[in-house]
């Protein structure tokens, strides 16, 4: 999978507005891509940070690529995976999510000095 494939998969005609099937599909897609990287030696896994606001359920997805020096503060890279209404959202923000997925894939095989946290934010 590459960046273009990820953008295409995320920027569909369903949109990714919170509470829609497209939003749920985007979350499942990101989780699937992260799970496919789990076998990599330096990817410590991912977790979901679920919350509820205004009657809606939200879920931030976080993955850490651990570094050697735990005394150094981690670097945080993030992008939101929801979109407004039924818009496909290639530029808002599927492209940035695709870049984060590629960063996870590239860093998963690297031994880093500093930890990196990748955050896929919900609305």
Annotate the PLM regions.
Residues 2-3, 54-57, 68-71, 110-113:
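Extracellular/periplasmic catalytic domains that process cell-envelope and extracellular macromolecules
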Residues 63, 77-123:
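Alpha-helical metal-binding/catalytic segments enriched in His/Glu/Asp
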Residues 17, 48-49, 68-70, 81-85, ...:
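Solvent-exposed loop/turn segments at secondary-structure junctions
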Residues 5, 37-39, 71-75, 112-117:
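Loop/turn elements at helix/coil->beta-strand transitions in domains of secreted/extracellular proteins
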Residues 1-4, 17-28, 90-98, 110:
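Soluble non-cytosolic domains of exported or imported proteins
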Residues 5-66:
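A non-catalytic alpha/beta surface segment that caps or lines the substrate-entry region
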């Amino acid at each position: 999978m590459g960046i273009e494939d990820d953008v295409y998969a995320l920027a569909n005609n369903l949109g990714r507005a919170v509470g829609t099937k497209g939003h749920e599909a985007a979350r499942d897609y990101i989780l699937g891509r992260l799970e496919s990287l789990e076998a990599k030696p330096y990817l410590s896994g991912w977790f979901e940070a679920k919350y509820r606001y205004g009657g809606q359920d939200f879920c931030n997805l976080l993955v850490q690529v651990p570094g050697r020096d735990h005394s150094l503060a981690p670097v945080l890279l993030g992008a939101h995976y929801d979109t407004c209404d039924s818009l496909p959202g290639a530029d808002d923000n599927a492209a940035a999510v695709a870049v984060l997925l590629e960063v996870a894939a590239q860093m998963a095989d690297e031994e880093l000095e500093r930890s990196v946290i990748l955050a896929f934010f919900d609305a």
